[in-house]
C-alpha cells in the first residue's frame, strides 16, 4: 500500500522527545533545531492545519539547571526537577512559536485526565478552544504530581492518548531513528526499514527493540504500544527521525519513515466507542424540535431537554430519547444529573444565572453524540 502524504491530514499531533530537544552534554535546549521545527509547525499552521505538540524535556532541563548528577533519579527528585524544568520548557516553546506569530498554550496532564471521562472532557475542551483560537497546545505529563503507580511513563503513549482525545487524524513520533526496522539496525547490518505497517502483528511487535537513553524513557516498544492506541482510535501514526533540521518538512518531501495505518477515522472510532462500549448511566428525554436538530447534526442544548432520569456525572454516557420514548442516540453529557435537572428547558444564556457558574452551552456536544438513523 502506498504511504499517505503529510498534507492529507488536518489535525496533527507532533511528539518531541527529550533526546531530540535537549543537548545531553550541555544540558541545554537545542535552540537551532527547535527553531527549525517551529518553522515546520508554522508552515503547517499557515496551511490551516491544527497542530498540537507533546513535548518531553522538563525533567532533563530541571536536572541540568539544578546540576544534578547523572544516573537514575528517585521519584521525588524527578518531580522536583520537573518543577524547575517545566518553567523553562514552556518559555522556550512560547518564544519559538511566538517568532512566527503563533501563541502556545501549556497543558499539563496526568494519567487520570485521559482515563476518567469527566477530566477527559475538560482536557479535550481546553485543547479544542486553543485550536479554535489558532494557538498550538503544548502538552506534557505533569511530572511534578505523577506517581510511579499512576502515570503514562513515557510520552509516546501520552501522545497517543492526546491524539485520541483530540480526535487527531495523524500522530507523528519524532525519534532518534527513522522508523521501524526488521531488526535493530545498530546490531544487524541487514536490517531494512518498513515503510508501511497495515496491522500490528506479533511479528511487528517482535521487531521492536528495548528502552531508550538516560534522557528518554521511551524505546521502540513504547512506540509500538502508542501505535496500537492511536490506530485503534482511528488515528494514523508515523515514526520518523527528528535528528535532522526541519524534520516535518522532510516527511512532507517523502523522507524515510514508517507509517502505521488505520482503516477507521477518529470520529467514527470515537462514536463507536460511545455507542457500543460505554454503559449508559441515565436518560435525557428531548422534545421534537431537539430531535430534528440532532438529526441535522447539531448539539443537544438544555432548552430541548424535557426530562432527566438516572444518576450520572459529567462525562458519563446517557441515552437520548425523543418525546415518544424511542431512542434517538447516546452521548457524553456535559452536566451531572442534578445540574441537568435544574437547567433542562432553559436557554443556554440562562445556565449561568441558574447554576451560578459559566457552564457549557451544550448539554451534549455533537462531537460527543451518536445519533441513530431516523425511523422510516
Swiss-Prot record:
Entry's localization field: Cytoplasm
Domain of life: Bacteria
Ranges where the PUA domain occurs: 281-358
Binding site for ATP: 15, 175-176
Any one GO molecular-function label of the UniProt entry: ATP binding
InterPro entries, sorted: AceGlu_kinase-like_sf (IPR036393), Asp/Glu/Uridylate_kinase (IPR001048), G5K_ProB (IPR041739), Glu/AcGlu_kinase (IPR001057), Glu_5kinase (IPR011529), Glu_5kinase/COase_Synthase (IPR005715), Glutamate_5-kinase_CS (IPR019797), PUA (IPR002478)
CDD domains referenced in this protein's UniProt entry, alphabetically: AAK_G5K_ProB (cd04242), PUA_G5K (cd21157)
Entry binding sites for substrate: 56, 143, 155
Enzymatic reactions: L-glutamate + ATP = L-glutamyl 5-phosphate + ADP
Gene Ontology CC entries for this record: cytosol
Gene3D superfamilies: Acetylglutamate kinase-like (3.40.1160.10), PUA domain (2.30.130.10)
HAMAP family assigned to the protein according to its UniProt record, in alphabetical order: ProB (MF_00456)
Assigned protein family: Belongs to the glutamate 5-kinase family.
Entry function: Catalyzes the transfer of a phosphate group to glutamate to form L-glutamate 5-phosphate.
Protein name as annotated: Glutamate 5-kinase
Organism ancestry: Bacteria, Pseudomonadati, Pseudomonadota, Alphaproteobacteria, Hyphomicrobiales
Gene name of the encoded protein: proB
Amino acid at each position: 500500500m502506498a504511504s499517505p502524504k503529510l498534507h492529507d491530514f488536518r489535525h496533527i499531533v507532533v511528539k518531541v522527545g527529550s533526546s531530540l530537544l535537549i543537548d545531553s552534554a550541555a544540558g541545554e535546549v537545542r535552540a537551532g533545531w527547535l527553531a527549525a521545527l517551529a518553522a515546520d509547525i508554522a508552515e503547517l499552521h499557515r496551511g490551516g492545519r491544527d497542530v498540537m505538540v507533546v513535548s518531553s524535556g522538563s525533567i532533563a532541563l530541571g536536572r541540568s539547571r539544578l546540576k544534578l548528577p547523572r544516573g537514575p533519579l528517585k521519584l521525588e527528585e524527578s518531580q522536583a526537577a520537573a518543577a524547575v524544568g517545566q518553567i523553562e520548557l514552556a518559555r522556550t516553546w512560547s518564544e519559538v512559536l511566538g517568532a512566527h506569530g503563533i501563541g502556545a498554550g501549556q497543558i499539563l496532564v496526568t494519567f487520570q485526565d485521559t482515563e476518567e471521562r469527566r477530566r477527559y472532557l475538560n482536557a479535550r475542551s481546553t485543547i479544542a478552544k486553543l485550536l479554535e483560537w489558532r494557538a498550538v497546545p503544548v502538552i506534557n505529563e505533569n511530572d511534578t504530581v505523577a506517581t510511579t503507580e499512576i502515570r503514562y511513563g513515557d510520552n509516546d503513549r501520552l501522545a497517543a492518548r492526546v491524539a485520541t482525545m483530540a480526535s487527531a487524524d495523524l500522530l507523528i513520533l519524532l525519534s532518534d531513528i527513522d522508523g521501524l526496522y526488521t531488526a535493530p539496525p545498530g546490531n544487524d547490518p541487514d536490517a531494512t526499514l518498513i515503510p508501511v505497517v497495515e496491522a500490528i502483528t506479533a511479528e511487528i511487535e517482535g521487531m521492536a527493540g528495548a528502552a531508550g537513553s538516560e534522557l528518554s524513557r521511551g524505546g521502540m516498544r513504547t512506540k509500538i504500544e502508542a501505535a496500537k492506541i492511536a490506530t485503534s482510535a482511528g488515528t494514523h501514526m508515523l515514526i520518523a527521525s527528528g535528528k535532522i533540521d526541519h524534520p516535518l518538512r522532510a516527511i512532507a518531501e517523502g523522507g524515510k519513515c514508517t507509517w502505521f495505518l488505520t482503516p477507521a477515522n477518529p470520529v467514527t472510532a470515537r462514536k463507536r466507542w460511545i455507542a457500543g462500549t460505554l454503559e449508559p448511566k441515565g436518560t435525557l428525554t428531548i422534545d421534537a424540535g431537539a430531535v430534528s436538530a440532532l438529526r441535522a447534526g447539531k448539539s443537544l442544548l438544555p432548552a430541548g431537554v424535557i426530562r432527566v432520569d438516572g444518576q450520572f456525572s459529567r462525562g458519563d454516557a446517557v441515552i437520548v430519547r425523543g418525546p415518544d420514548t424511542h431512542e434517538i442516540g447516546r452521548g457524553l453529557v456535559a452536566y451531572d444529573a442534578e445540574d441537568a435537572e435544574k437547567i433542562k428547558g432553559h436557554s443556554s444564556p440562562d445556565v449561568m444565572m441558574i447554576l451560578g457558574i459559566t457552564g457549557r452551552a451544550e448539554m451534549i456536544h455533537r462531537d460527543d453524540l451518536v445519533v441513530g438513523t431516523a425511523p422510516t
